[in-house]
Amino acid sequence: MDIAGSLCNASEGPVLRPEARVSGNGDLQFLGWNVPPDQIQHIPEHWLTQLEPPASMHYMLGVFYIFLFCASTVGNGMVIWIFSTSKALRTPSNMFVLNLAVFDFIMCLKAPIFIYNSFHRGFALGNTGCQIFAAIGSYSGIGAGMTNAAIGYDRLNVITKPMNRNMTFTKAIIMNVIIWLYCTPWVVLPLTQFWDRFVPEGYLTSCTFDYLTDNFDTRLFVGTIFFFSFVCPTLMIIYYYSQIVGHVFSHEKALREQAKKMNVESLRSNVDKSKDTAEIRIAKAAITICFLFFVSWTPYGVMSLIGAFGDKSLLTPGATMIPACTCKLVACIDPFVYAISHPRYRMELQKRCPWLAIDEKAPESSSAASTTTTQEQQQTTAA
């Protein structure tokens, strides 16, 4: 029996590539066995030497992505709906929250491509589907990182300069436009193959930029995009939130020292003792989301560096699918972090969806909060 016949008997469908040799035990093919010959050129050679995973792994990931798609679509859809239609939430600062939700929503739009490929066990939608998948992922991933940095910048101004907030709608819109423009080159360059290209990875069901081709241009692209899309936003996030934490600690220390001089237990009201201020709660939500961004994208960044500069044998199809899934998971979790931590969003959600049984107390009036803040600052200054 010839090789093609052996492969047909070992697979559940027709083998389009006879050169996808049968493995030693005779019951598994190499990846790409069901890819048309005219599509093979788009797949890095590294993956064509890896064994095809069991069909159950494809189906399990497909079901997992169905869950991610539903949760992300509903969660981010609600954030976009409420933040864009509620007057109470229509503030310059929340323009960044809305922008992040848009990026996360876009991220989930590529899930149907992955799901279709998974249930067809490979590169079913071909190079066209791959380019769409990777372009969406690049825009949404890089955009989410830079938006998280912008949120950190805004939170720093709100908390350290509460009486001199200089964020306006115009400035917020300009910053969001800059973020979108910042993402564009990292999508257009590989999409047009001017610099690098988008290729399938892992089980050939997802796509990203090429980090496996062994040449200088690929290594330069990987190093450049790693710096500008991951290192830069991460450093900005760390700086902004370290400044916020430092300011909060120094402010609390000053209040305690002043209270001690005045022989009182605390300068804060009973309301402030029982709960954090709205600004701090929002900052906590932002810190959580930035932490999720770092945790979810770090494995992917490390994987791409290994592919470009390290030992490629470490990159098995199964190992590369783990970071590919974790970086999608954050887009699903983000909206629920805000649902838990953002007080005004919770109030609006409670009003529009009472069946969710959210119990969020109305915050103090802005005037009262402003008066309290002013008194604290005056007392601290007097010290």
From Swiss-Prot:
GO terms for molecular function: G protein-coupled photoreceptor activity. GO terms for biological process: phototransduction; visual perception. SUPFAM superfamilies: Family A G protein-coupled receptor-like. CDD domains: 7tmA_photoreceptors_insect (cd15079). PROSITE patterns: G_PROTEIN_RECEP_F1_2, OPSIN. The modification N6-(retinylidene)lysine is found at residue 328. Residues 1-57, 118-133, 197-220, 309-316 are extracellular. Glycans are attached at residue 9. Signal peptide: none annotated. Disulfide bonds join 130-207. InterPro entries: GPCR_opsins (IPR050125), GPCR_Rhodpsn (IPR000276), GPCR_Rhodpsn_7TM (IPR017452), Opsin (IPR001760), Retinal_BS (IPR027430). Residues 364-383 have a biased composition (Low complexity). It is a multi-pass membrane protein. Phosphorylated on some or all of the serine and threonine residues present in the C-terminal region. Keywords: Chromophore, Disulfide bond, G-protein coupled receptor, Glycoprotein, Membrane, Phosphoprotein, Photoreceptor protein, Receptor, Retinal protein, Sensory transduction, Transducer, Transmembrane, Transmembrane helix, Vision. It is found in: Membrane. It holds the Pfam family 7tm_1. It comes from the Eukaryota. The chain crosses the membrane at residues 58-82, 95-117, 134-153, 172-196, 221-248, 285-308, 317-341. Belongs to the G-protein coupled receptor 1 family. Opsin subfamily. Each Drosophila eye is composed of 800 facets or ommatidia. Each ommatidium contains 8 photoreceptor cells (R1-R8), the R1 to R6 cells are outer cells, while R7 and R8 are inner cells. PANTHER family: OPSIN. This is Opsin Rh4.
